[in-house]
């Protein structure tokens, strides 16, 4: 093994992790070797096993400018350390396995993989944090490897049934991104669980086995992740199997399986299959029209704003005389917000019936209160009467009916939906009249509506209470509001950077992963305030913990920032350096856009570096095509580098030309030679440009194009006695009856005032109207060529 490959195989770095994440998303796991610019012999940024203060040349543009006073010369500032990323337990081992698999190296030891699998799935299940798509993909890949490779004969069973069940619990936590890999993981887990259970059971025990929750969990995965049609077929097959084995009587809780499929079909918008499966559920499974089923059908039609169907399913008698659930009524309230008039006319008697029911449930009454705020425009004074009735206990018989923090929270949410933060604050004051103690959701609602009102100080007061432990926060339920808080702070005209860093530090201690929109907001505000190390910290901490879709969202924002005319060139280049370091999966189209943005900034040297990084990328799919070579050379033709001569071996043009010579995937054609002529002529070397014309274009089977002719005449303008080169070409054009260039371009190309006067006299006589229009554009004087018309001359390859 070559030395640098051996070192990379034994040294796991965050840079490798970022590339692994990029590979899992962009290539569905087809990891490419690291580029020499992103991970080289100089070592990558933030080496976990070495001093993190050693930053490579790749990010030298991100270092701070040294500023010292006289006294500080003797008391140097402490060195700034880059924050290392936090990995979920076991995740780094899974990444190492994927790297070894793609690069065909020896994988980590089996016991390490088993331990990593157990740690990650147990951590996710215990903390209620969903797997992101990358983690689900890697878990599925490692599990497949562990199942197809056998452990040593004397080794204990490495993955126990409880480990597989933990993994299934983790897979069932709904992710933010695509659930494709979660479903694949759940399938493999279910197959292995079923295999292990059946292989250990005799026929009599198998009947008891069928009462287990394995099948229900698998159906939940299917219905949750878009496989409801398959789930419907599985349920019918499973039920028939139970009947054939006379085991249906042992299977308790079968109703929830049928209901899960109904809910999945409704969520996927499959109306025909939903109605058909409902008929089968009644006939085969004996499912009744219970409140849960009532909620599924009413919610399905209400979300589609089909009021007649909603009325029909709502009015159907519920089994055993039960009342609709509170969630059903809440969905009707949401529908009334979309088209209030026709819904409220129907909902008025519906909620009157709810309020007058002595046995009404608390959820139904809370829904009524929300509807009163949203539809009837009731304020705190009007709601107070209802709350007093609920709190008295004289009318409603259910012991659950009481005024608590949940009631106030829903009223505050209704006020927020109306865009009235002042009303939401009054509802909180109303809660104090009833001696209601705030819970975590109360504080989060307060923080949210204060942010909506741009009350930064008020939101900070709530943040301080949460940070001091006024209430216990479980399962990161405060993260959505904290992300919103950070985004609002970043959007201020003069952001308080220190305040932002205080919040991010508090979240970092919890190892919380921010939303991609928040990461973008933080990075941009830090870039705009030249806080480059804070950008590095933000990307280092979060870029390895998010899915490839979220990574794409972040790098797209970086590309937009770099290409924005409002961004200074220095900041744009700093942002590009970080983009290249942390997001090697940046698409070719975006890289071309970056290259052209630097050409537009009149920074061709930077544009050529972007092109060079594309050419040096280890992923062949990222290499420039012939069209991209042309666009780069055209850019050099528009804005050459004044201090560089094309013949200089270190020039940007020479670098691009050498890359083209060495690129075996690109076949030379007239368009490429045209682009080379443009670049060399613009760079001050028209003779080399004419060599391409004489030695390649005129002798090729493809021959010159109209653009070739325009470019070669321009080259002739740039050299002494250029008419000697131009006349033979011109004569050939006349013989072939080709289209003659416009009058203005021809006039401007003539080398001296005498020739221009002769041409003008001829043009006035032959084309009087065209010449008059040309004269209306005006002229300007040049030092050697005399007057020229004010027309823009653009060349394309």
Curated annotation (Swiss-Prot):
The biological processes this protein is annotated with in GO are: mitochondrial gene expression
Major site of localization recorded for this protein: mitochondrion
Q: Which GO terms describe its molecular function?
A: mRNA binding
Q: Has UniProt tagged this entry with the keyword Mitochondrion?
A: yes
This protein's transit peptide sits at 1-69
Keywords, A to Z?
Chaperone, Mitochondrion, Transit peptide
Q: Which InterPro entries match?
A: TPR-like_helical_dom_sf (IPR011990)
* Compartments reported by the entry: Mitochondrion
- Please provide one cellular component term from the Gene Ontology annotations of this protein: mitochondrion
**What is the stated purpose of this protein?**
Chaperone protein involved in the assembly of the mitochondrial NADH:ubiquinone oxidoreductase complex (complex I).
Return the protein name: Complex I intermediate-associated protein 84, mitochondrial
**Gene source species:** Neurospora crassa (strain ATCC 24698 / 74-OR23-1A / CBS 708.71 / DSM 1257 / FGSC 987)
């Amino acid at each position: 093994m070559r030395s640098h490959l051996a070192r990379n195989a034994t040294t796991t770095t965050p840079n490798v992790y970022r590339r692994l994440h990029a590979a899992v998303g962009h290539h569905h796991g087809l990891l490419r070797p690291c580029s020499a610019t992103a991970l080289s012999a100089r070592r990558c940024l933030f080496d976990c096993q070495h001093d993190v203060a050693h930053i490579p040349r790749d990010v030298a543009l991100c270092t701070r400018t040294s500023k010292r006073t006289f006294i500080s010369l003797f008391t140097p500032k402490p060195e700034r350390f880059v924050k290392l990323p936090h990995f979920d337990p076991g995740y780094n081992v899974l990444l190492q396995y994927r790297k070894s698999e793609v690069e065909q190296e020896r994988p980590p030891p089996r016991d390490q993989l088993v331990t990593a699998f157990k740690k990650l799935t147990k951590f996710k299940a215990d903390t209620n944090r969903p797997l992101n798509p990358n983690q689900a993909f890697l878990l599925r890949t490692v599990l497949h490897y562990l199942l197809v490779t056998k452990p040593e004969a004397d080794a204990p069973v490495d993955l126990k049934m409880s480990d597989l069940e933990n993994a299934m619990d983790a897979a069932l936590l709904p992710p933010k991104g695509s659930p494709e890999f979660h479903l694949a993981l759940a399938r493999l887990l279910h197959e292995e669980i079923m295999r292990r259970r059946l292989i250990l059971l005799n026929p009599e025990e198998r009947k008891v086995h069928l009462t287990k929750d394995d099948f229900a969990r698998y159906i939940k995965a299917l219905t949750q992740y878009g496989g409801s049609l398959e789930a419907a077929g599985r349920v019918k097959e499973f039920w028939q199997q139970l009947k054939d084995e006379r085991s249906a009587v042992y299977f308790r809780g079968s109703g929830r399986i049928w209901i899960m499929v109904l809910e999945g079909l409704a969520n996927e918008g499959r109306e025909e299959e939903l109605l058909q499966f409902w008929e089968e559920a009644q006939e085969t499974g004996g499912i009744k029209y219970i409140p849960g089923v009532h909620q599924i059908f009413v919610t399905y039609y209400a979300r589609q704003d089909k009021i007649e169907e909603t009325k029909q399913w709502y009015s159907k008698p519920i089994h055993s005389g039960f009342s609709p659930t509170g969630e059903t009524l809440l969905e009707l309230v949401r529908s009334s917000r979309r088209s209030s008039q026709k819904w409220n006319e129907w909902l008025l008697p519906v909620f009157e019936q709810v309020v007058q029911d002595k046995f009404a449930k608390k959820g139904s009454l809370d829904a009524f209160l929300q509807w009163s705020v949203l539809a009837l425009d009731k304020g705190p004074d009007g709601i107070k009467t209802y709350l007093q009735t609920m709190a008295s206990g004289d009318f409603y018989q259910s012991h659950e009916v009481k005024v608590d923090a949940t009631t106030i929270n829903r009223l505050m949410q209704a006020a927020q939906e109306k865009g009235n933060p002042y009303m939401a604050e009054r509802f909180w004051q109303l809660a104090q009249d009833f001696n209601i103690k705030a819970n975590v959701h109360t504080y989060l609602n307060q923080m949210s509506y204060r942010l909506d009102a741009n009350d930064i100080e008020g939101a900070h007061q709530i943040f301080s209470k949460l940070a001091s432990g006024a209430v216990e926060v479980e399962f990161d339920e405060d993260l959505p509001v904290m992300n919103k808080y950070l985004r609002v702070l970043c959007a201020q005209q003069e952001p308080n950077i220190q305040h932002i860093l205080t919040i991010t530090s508090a979240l970092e201690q919890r190892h919380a992963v921010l939303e991609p929109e928040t990461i973008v907001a933080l990075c941009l505000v830090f870039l705009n305030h030249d806080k480059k190390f804070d950008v590095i910290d933000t990307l280092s901490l979060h870029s390895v913990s998010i899915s490839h879709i979220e990574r794409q969202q972040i790098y797209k924002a970086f590309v937009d920032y770099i290409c924005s005319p409002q961004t200074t060139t220095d900041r744009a280049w700093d942002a590009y350096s970080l983009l290249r370091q942390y997001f090697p999966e940046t698409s070719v189209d975006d890289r071309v856009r970056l290259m052209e943005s630097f050409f537009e900034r009149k920074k061709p040297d930077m544009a050529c570096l972007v092109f060079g990084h594309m050419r040096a990328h280890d992923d062949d799919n990222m290499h420039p095509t012939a069209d991209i070579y042309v666009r780069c050379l055209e850019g050099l033709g528009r804005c050459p580098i004044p201090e560089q001569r094309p013949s200089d071996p270190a020039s940007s043009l020479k670098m691009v030309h050498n890359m083209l010579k060495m690129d075996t995937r690109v076949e030379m054609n007239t368009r490429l030679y045209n682009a080379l002529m443009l670049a060399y002529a613009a760079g001050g070397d028209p003779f080399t440009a004419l060599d391409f014309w004489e030695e390649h274009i005129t002798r090729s089977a493809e021959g010159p194009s109209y653009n070739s002719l325009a470019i070669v005449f321009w080259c002739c303008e740039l050299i002494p006695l250029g008419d000697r080169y131009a006349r033979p070409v011109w004569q050939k054009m006349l013989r072939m009856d080709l289209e003659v260039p416009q009058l203005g371009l021809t006039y401007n190309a003539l080398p001296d005032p005498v020739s221009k006067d002769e041409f003008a006299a001829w043009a006035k006589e032959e084309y009087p109207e065209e010449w008059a229009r040309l004269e209306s554009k005006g002229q300007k004087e040049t030092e050697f060529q005399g007057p020229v018309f004010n027309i823009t001359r653009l060349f394309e390859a």
